[in-house]
Amino acid sequence: MLTVISPAKTLDYDTPPVTERFTLPQYLDDSQELIVQLRELSPAQISELMHLSDKLAGLNAARFGSWTPDFTPANAKQALLAFKGDVYTGLDAETLSEDDFTYAQQHLRMLSGLYGLLRPLDLMQPYRLEMGTKLANARGKDLYAFWGTRISQWLNQALTEQGDDLLLNLASNEYFSAVKRSALKGRVINVDFKDLKNGQYKIISFYAKKARGMMSRFVIQERVNDPQQLKQFDVQGYYYSAEQSKPDHLVFLRDHPAE
């Protein structure tokens, strides 16, 4: 089973990584093509394009300017440890074992507007470029056009390497839309996490994001390779709902959010 998750806007390059192992991103030629274009934008243009404050626009203009295709532990960090935010709070990668990292390297992928697709131990230089950004480029009107079917093809390769055709989608709609389903040679399993609020079960963004991270961790630590095993997920009060689920769309409910 191959799990895909979204990246995060929040990054941590201050905390030392808990593992010295690293790999290099596989699609840096594409990343560099985007960087060349992004460097042509002023901070004001970045602010308008990405809907950022002047401060954040300036920060990311500087990031694009200092980006280099030569990745080292001195200027980059393993992607799974660099990303922060709700999903990564739930995943809590800093407490994974070396064996867990080995498993994750084969069975987990992070979608990215700049890097396309990242493995957990791929070094990543800091950036901000959401997949939904309408950055016109030589390949089309936005990043979905830029990546085209590439991400699907790379996922097909990863599915082949890890031994089955099961793709667990724990990414947001914005990011999974970069996966062209017509080009994907795998069975996609979608998951929803719903919390009880005002008498109804609803998807609450903050809780759902964290739950995606917790399920990603569950898959890694339990070495899950069968959709039936996913139904055993019961972290922080979630439980599988057979009534609301379908074979390729699993629903988990929670009656009381964990403190």
Curated annotation (Swiss-Prot):
Pfam families xrefs: H2O2_YaaD
One term under GO cellular component: cytosol
One of the GO BP terms on file: response to hydroperoxide
Signal sequence range: none
Cited InterPro entries: YaaA
Family: Belongs to the UPF0246 family.
PANTHER family: PEROXIDE STRESS RESISTANCE PROTEIN YAAA, PEROXIDE STRESS RESPONSE PROTEIN YAAA
Listed name of the protein: UPF0246 protein PputW619_0896
